[in-house]
Amino acid sequence: MHYIGIDIGSTAAKVSVFKEDELAFNFTMPTGWSSIETSKVIEKNLIEKGIDLEKSNIIATGYGRISVPYADKTITEITCHGRGTHYLLGKDATVIDIGGQDTKIITLENGRVTNFTMNDKCAAGTGRFLELMANTLGVAIDDLANMALEGEDINITSMCTVFAESEVISLIGSGTKKESIARGIINSITGRVYAIAHKHGIRGTVF
């Protein structure tokens, strides 16, 4: 029996396949413009890997979970975060999820989600913000963190993503090193997420 978890987020889709109690394989892919098309590609990939979907237990989550017609059940991301964290840690924890379109802070007590806070009103403090800033710098989003380690502290003061982009463009124009701008971007999103988490309250291990 295969147990398959499919998470179609706003920017990326993640798939994990367990055979009984062991992870068999996983893969990720961009969500693209259509979660329905992404779901079809995932289905094709699973079949090509020899997975019999009819004999598998499939759970879908994420923004595009309703686009997975071959799923046996759909579950919210918050519930999945709770169950997954309890499976991995087995103790009380605070989960911080910086997604493509929102940031979630989730409190987990005795294996159950007891509280959560979601910032979905503004792109600032989300993966979209990081993606936009990386594009503005002309670098891959995966390279931002390593670049930031080599930069000097500067402040990205704008709280709005559009204004922050303009601020980054101005910094580039003034000759500020990309590494320092990357550091400012990382510090900016870290500060925003910390403010949300501090207001929410931290319990146990931060995951």
For the regions a protein language model found, what residue spans apply to each?
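Phosphate/pyrophosphate-binding loops at sites that engage ATP/ADP/AMP, CoA/4′-phosphopantetheine
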Residues: E43-S56, V193-G204
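Adenine-nucleotide phosphate-binding core of ATP-dependent small-molecule kinases
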Residues: S166-R203
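Gly/Thr-rich phosphate-binding beta-strand-loop-beta motif of the actin/hexokinase/Hsp70
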Residues: M1-E20, D92-R112
